[in-house]
Every structure is written in structure tokens, then in C-alpha cells.
């Protein structure tokens, strides 16, 4: 078990079933790009607060995460709410069971700033999407604003208390994804952090 997995396992004990204000905004904005016949991959699904809410909008969801604690909480909430079209799995996005051109939509909420090898991950996301597939992400872009939160996160990360977080600017993040054979179709600020909701289409 690596440090990130241990951290999120600890955090999972404080998870709540209902999405917070920002997560609710993510759900609202995502629904525009979801349809009843779509097969979705939720990359870094966490506690399932978003996953379980959007399940009724799509055909099926494959939800993956590194944290067994988060997945356990998500699965329990799905069962309690009789949600049957989500498969929760503790695997990485590079798991060989995930086949190329399988998914209509891939979600990555509060995930990308933790990734060390972005180009490789973006390439993988692109390969898993069907032609013209949609990649929806929401990411804290800490370079956009000097704040106490930004410096505190950096300090805690250096101490190893929280996982390492990359500090992106909005345009920088969009360019990284675009370079993986995507085009931007929507980009909006959804929190004061600031966090950006970005929708990309596979070229």
C-alpha cells in the first residue's frame, strides 16, 4: 500500500454520502454530456458521492480508485440506494481489463492534480474512449490564485502529510490535455479555490 492509498483510506472514514456544493455543481454540469445509453468510466471515483448520483443518467459506470476505504464506502452507499449499474473496482487506469475504445465518457474529478505522469495518463484516457468520446474533469488549478490554501497544501505535501499535488494554471492544464489528442468544448470556473470544470472531446 503506497502513501496516497493510505491517505485516502484514512480520509474515507470521514466521507459523507451527499455531495458538497462544488460536487453538486459538477453533477449539474456533467449531466449535459450524459445520456441513458452511455458507458462511463469514473477514474478516481473516491467516495462515490458523484458516481452514485449520476448513475441514473447513464447505462453503466465502471468506477475505479486506489483506495479500498473509499470504494467500500461508495459500494455501501450504492447498495443502500439500490443502485445496480455501477461496478466499483480497486485498479489503476492502466489495468489490462480496461480495453481500448470501450467508454463513451470518462470522468476524472479531483484527480488530475495528483497525477505525476500526465501525458501518459491523458494518452491512456484517449485510448479508452470511443471515437468522439468525451473526457470530463474537474481540477484545482492552484497557480491561478495566490492563497493560504495553496501554500498550506504545498507545505503539507512536502512533509508527506498529504499526497503530492501538482499546481496547474487553467491554460496549462487545458494544453496538457489537448496535446493528448483532445479538443476543448467547455471550460468554466466552479469554485473560488479555483477549481475548473473542463470538457474535452476526443479528436
Describe the predicted segments one by one.
Residues 181, 186-203:
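Core SAM-dependent methyltransferase catalytic element
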Residues 1-35, 143, 153-156, 191-193:
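Conserved class I S-adenosyl-L-methionine
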Residues 107:
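A conserved beta-strand element that flanks and buttresses the S-adenosyl-L-methionine
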Residues 119-131:
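A short glycine-rich, Lys/Arg-flanked "PGG" loop and its adjoining helix->strand segment in the class I
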Residues 138-180, 185-188:
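C-terminal alpha-helical "lid/dimerization" subdomain adjacent to the S-adenosyl-L-methionine
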Residues 39, 133-134:
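Short glycine-centered segments of the SAM/dcSAM-binding site in methyltransferase folds
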Amino acid at each position: 500500500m503506497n502513501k496516497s492509498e493510505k491517505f485516502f483510506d484514512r480520509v474515507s472514514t470521514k466521507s459523507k454520502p451527499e455531495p458538497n456544493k462544488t460536487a453538486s455543481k459538477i453533477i449539474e454540469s456533467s449531466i449535459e454530456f450524459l445520456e441513458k445509453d452511455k458507458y462511463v468510466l469514473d477514474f478516481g471515483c473516491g467516495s462515490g458521492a458523484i458516481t452514485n448520483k449520476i448513475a441514473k443518467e447513464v447505462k453503466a459506470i465502471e468506477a475505479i480508485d486506489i483506495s479500498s476505504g473509499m470504494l467500500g464506502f461508495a459500494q455501501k452507499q450504492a447498495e443502500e440506494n439500490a443502485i445496480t449499474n455501477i461496478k466499483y473496482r480497486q485498479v489503476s487506469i492502466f489495468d489490462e481489463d480496461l480495453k481500448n475504445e470501450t467508454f463513451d465518457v470518462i470522468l476524472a474529478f479531483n484527480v488530475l492534480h495528483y497525477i505525476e505522469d500526465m501525458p501518459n495518463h491523458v494518452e491512456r484516457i484517449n485510448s479508452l474512449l470511443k471515437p468522439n468520446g468525451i473526457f470530463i474533469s474537474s481540477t484545482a488549478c492552484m497557480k491561478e490564485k495566490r492563497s493560504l490554501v495553496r501554500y498550506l497544501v504545498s507545505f503539507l505535501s512536502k512533509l508527506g502529510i498529504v499526497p503530492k499535488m501538482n499546481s496547474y494554471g487553467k491554460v496549462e492544464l487545458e494544453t496538457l490535455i489537448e496535446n493528448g489528442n483532445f479538443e476543448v468544448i467547455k471550460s468554466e470556473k466552479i469554485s473560488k479555490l479555483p477549481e475548473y470544470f473542463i470538457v474535452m472531446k476526443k479528436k
